Amino acid sequence: MIREIDKNYMKLALSLAKKRKGYTHPNPTVGAVVVKEGKIVGLGYHEKAGKPHAEVMALGQAGEKAKGATLYVTLEPCTHFGRTPPCTDAIIRSGIKRVVVATLDPNPLMSGKGVEKLRNAGIEVDVGVCEEEARELNEDFFTYITQERPYITLKWAQTLDGKLATLTGSSKWITSKESRKVAHILRREATAVLVGVNTVIKDDPHLTVRFVPTEKQPVRIILDPELEVPLSAKVLNTEEAPTIVITKKENEKAEKLKEKGVQVLILKGFNLKNILKKLKELEIMHLMVEGGPRTLTSFLKEGFFDRIVVFIAPKIMGEGLSIGDLGIRSIEESLKVRKKKVENLGEDLVIFFKRY
C-alpha cells in the first residue's frame, strides 16, 4: 500500500537523480533511497555510464541495515547484464523487504521484468509513486528508447518581432549574459549540440559549455552536406570537445578534417531521418539543435522535436531571418506546442514548450 511518506522518500530519490542530469547518457538518471524503521540508511545515484547504478550505491551504503528495509528507486531496477550486472540480483541478495518504484522501464522488452523478478523472490513491490515527475526527469531516455532516435531540443534566441538573425546572418548577441548562462546549462544536459554549417561560417562558435561548471562537454555536430566548413573553425578544435561533421561528400577536405581529429560521417542518403538514426547508433541520447534558422526550420518541418526553448530579447529588428517556410497555409495547420515554463532572465524571457 502506498502512503504519503512513500512520496516524500521518492522525492528525495528524485532530487538525488537530478544531481547527475546530463552526465549519465546513454543511461537514465536514477536516484535511490534505503529506509529502515523510519530512518534513511542508504542514498545513491547513478553517476555515469559504466559506474554502479543508484540501487547498488544505496545498498552499499546501507550494508547490513538493508535487511528488512524499503528501497525507493526512481526507475524500475534492471534485470540484464549491460555495462554493469543486474540491479535486481543485488536487491535480492541484500535482503530488502519492499521496493517502491516510481516508473517502469520504457523498453517494451524489459518493462515489468524487474518488478516481476523481485516479486518472484518474495519482495513486496509498489509502482507509480511520483511517476509523472520520474518520467519527466528521464523524458530524454524514454524518447531515446521508444522512438529509436535522440530526444530533440530545439533552442533559439529571437527578438521581440521573431527574428533569429539579421539579413546578413549576424546573431551575436541577441540575448543577455543571463540568457546565455541558461543556454549553457541546457548544453550541459545534452549529449550533443547540432548546428548547420552556415552557423559555423557566420558565427564561428565554440559550442562548448563555458559559463557554468561542467564535468564533460557535449559532442559538437555540424550538418555540412557540401563540406563547406572552414578548416580554421573553432568547432574543429577537438581538444575542447569531440566534433562530428555529417556530409554527403567524400574528398580531400574530409581527410583533412579526420587529420584534425574530427569524425566525418558520410551519408549518401543525407536527410534528417537517416541522420537521427545514425546518431542513435552513436548513443546520442539528447540532441540540442541550436541553429541557424535553416536547420531549425528543417527539424520543425519534419516534426523532429520534443522540446522547444525560446529566449526572447526586448529588441526589434524589422527585416531579418526567422523560422522559414513550414508548408503551412492556414492557421489550423500551425504546429501546436504546449507551454511548460516561463522564466525572467534580466530583461529577457525564456519559454519552454513541449510538443503535444
From Swiss-Prot:
One of its GO terms (biological process) is riboflavin biosynthetic process. Pfam families: dCMP_cyt_deam_1, RibD_C. GO terms for molecular function: 5-amino-6-(5-phosphoribosylamino)uracil reductase activity; diaminohydroxyphosphoribosylaminopyrimidine deaminase activity; NADP binding; zinc ion binding. Zn(2+) binds at residues 53, 78, 87. The active site is at 55 (proton donor). Residues 1-148 are annotated as: Deaminase. Its cofactor is Zn(2+). Residues 4-126 form the CMP/dCMP-type deaminase domain. NADP(+) binds at residues 157, 173, 199, 203, 292-298. Substrate binds at residues 171, 187, 207, 210, 290. Pathway: Cofactor biosynthesis; riboflavin biosynthesis; 5-amino-6-(D-ribitylamino)uracil from GTP: step 2/4; Cofactor biosynthesis; riboflavin biosynthesis; 5-amino-6-(D-ribitylamino)uracil from GTP: step 3/4. CDD domains: Riboflavin_deaminase-reductase (cd01284). It catalyses: 2,5-diamino-6-hydroxy-4-(5-phosphoribosylamino)-pyrimidine + H2O + H(+) = 5-amino-6-(5-phospho-D-ribosylamino)uracil + NH4(+); 5-amino-6-(5-phospho-D-ribitylamino)uracil + NADP(+) = 5-amino-6-(5-phospho-D-ribosylamino)uracil + NADPH + H(+). Binds 1 zinc ion. NCBIfam families: eubact_ribD, ribD_Cterm. In the N-terminal section; belongs to the cytidine and deoxycytidylate deaminase family. Converts 2,5-diamino-6-(ribosylamino)-4(3h)-pyrimidinone 5'-phosphate into 5-amino-6-(ribosylamino)-2,4(1h,3h)-pyrimidinedione 5'-phosphate. This is Riboflavin biosynthesis protein RibD. It comes from Aquifex aeolicus (strain VF5).
